């Protein structure tokens, strides 16, 4: 079993969501033996990426789980084990999603904000980040990253690209882009338990 006294999981939400998402809440409910942290992700990737790397380091994350946009960020947390569910690797290409203007969060942030604004500069910052997605990869941190892909995801389809980078760490499941509790319960959570128990048994 896990030898560490406290195992920390950081969950990174998707676009338009916040650290108060139902997915983070469900993970905390079903994995009470772990410390589950669910930060609000800054809107601008130029701020978000360094913030998340520092956040994971400061909190000594054992595992980073991300969905959609959060999975794209999770993949870049190179120093940690990562689970990337339906990763939106190229947000700037999702022109029907990432639009200039002011938008409503699905649920308010942990500081009570209900809206966020996308500017042309933010979209350009996504493009800049995307041009360096794999710069920090090496053989060691590749093996610590897994991609989960829903067979009914009609929003993003970067499975083949992910497979080229992280073969053979790709797992397909029956489901769409947005996670539901059934997929969390039957697919993601069992893998989390298996991964953490296997990783720390010998420490």
Where are these regions (language model features)?
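Glycine-rich phosphate-binding loop signature in dinucleotide/nucleotide-binding domains
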Residues: 3-4, 57-60, 140, 195
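Short hydrophobic segments within beta-strands
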Residues: 11-15, 65, 148-150
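Internal alpha/beta domain cores that form substrate/cofactor-binding pockets in large enzymes
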Residues: 37-39, 73-85
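Residue in the alpha/beta-hydrolase core beta-strand immediately N-terminal to the catalytic nucleophile
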Residues: 62-65, 81-83
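Gly/Ala-rich beta-loop-alpha elbow adjacent to hydrolase catalytic centers
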Residues: 64-75
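The alpha/beta-hydrolase serine catalytic core
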Residues: 81-203
């Amino acid at each position: 079993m896990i030898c560490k006294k406290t195992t920390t999981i950081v969950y990174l939400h998707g676009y338009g969501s916040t650290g108060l998402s139902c997915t983070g809440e469900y993970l905390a409910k079903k994995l009470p033996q772990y410390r589950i942290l669910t930060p609000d992700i800054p809107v601008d990737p130029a701020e978000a990426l360094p913030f998340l790397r520092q956040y994971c380091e400061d909190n000594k994350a054992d595992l980073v789980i991300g969905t959609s946009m959060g999975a794209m960020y999770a993949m870049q947390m190179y120093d940690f084990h990562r689970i990337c569910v339906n990763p939106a690797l190229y947000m700037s290409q999702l022109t029907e999603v990432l639009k200039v203007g002011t938008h409503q969060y699905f649920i308010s942030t942990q500081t009570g904000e209900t809206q966020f604004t996308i500017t042309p500069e933010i979209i350009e910052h996504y493009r800049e980040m995307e041009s360096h997605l794999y710069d920090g990869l090496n053989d060691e941190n590749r093996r610590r990253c897994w991609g989960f892909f829903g067979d009914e995801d009609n929003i993003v389809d970067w499975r083949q690209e992910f497979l080229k980078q992280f073969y053979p760490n790709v797992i397909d499941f029956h489901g769409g882009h947005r996670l539901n509790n059934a997929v969390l319960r039957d697919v993601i959570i069992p893998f989390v338990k298996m991964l953490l128990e296997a990783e720390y048994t010998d420490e």
